[in-house]
Regions:
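Extended, low-hydrophobicity, polar/charged segments
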Residues: 1-158
């Protein structure tokens, strides 16, 4: 079944399988490149979307997995996690760091592991959904699986 997935999504599927996470990547008929579009396509609350945002901090990429209902307060987050300035990565930096385009960045399947922060608000949902490597692909998992998959640090991000 993974043969029918886009190449980038196959890398994500392999990473999920290696981590023992059963979430199956599904292909949506229309692009869901924002949390609101993904939530509408899945008929779920926008807060249950694990939005993958790539920032640049201390000369390296920083992946923030935030609830689709939140905006990241970069100044507050930098202080909470002991980082210097946190700024949005450029599309080129996102692609170089993740191998995936903006709007489809998965929490896994990257060329190298990324320092990851996971929004504590995602713990409120029994199931969350994340992008599967393209704007047309998504997969379900639990909060605990997301933290384990990414090796992320749980923090308040808004």
């Amino acid at each position: 079944m993974t043969d029918a997935l886009p190449t980038r999504s196959r890398l994500v599927a392999a990473s999920l399988e290696a981590a023992g996470i059963a979430g199956t990547i599904i292909v949506l008929p229309d692009a869901a490149s924002t949390a609101a579009l993904a939530a509408a396509a899945l008929d779920i609350e926008v807060g249950a979307i694990a939005n993958s945002l790539v920032f640049w901090s201390d000369d390296e990429p920083l992946l923030v997995m935030t609830s689709g209902a939140h905006r990241v307060d970069t100044a507050a987050l930098a202080e909470r996690i002991g980082r210097g300035d946190i700024r949005r990565a450029t599309p080129e930096q996102v692609l170089a760091a993740t191998g995936q385009p903006i709007g489809g960045v998965a929490p896994t399947g990257h060329p190298a592991p990324l320092t990851t922060i996971v929004d504590e608000a995602l713990a409120a949902f029994p199931q969350i959904w994340a992008a599967g490597g393209t704007p047309h692909t998504v997969f379900p998992l639990t909060f605990d699986e997301l933290v384990r998959l990414t090796g992320g640090t749980v923090a308040k991000v808004d």
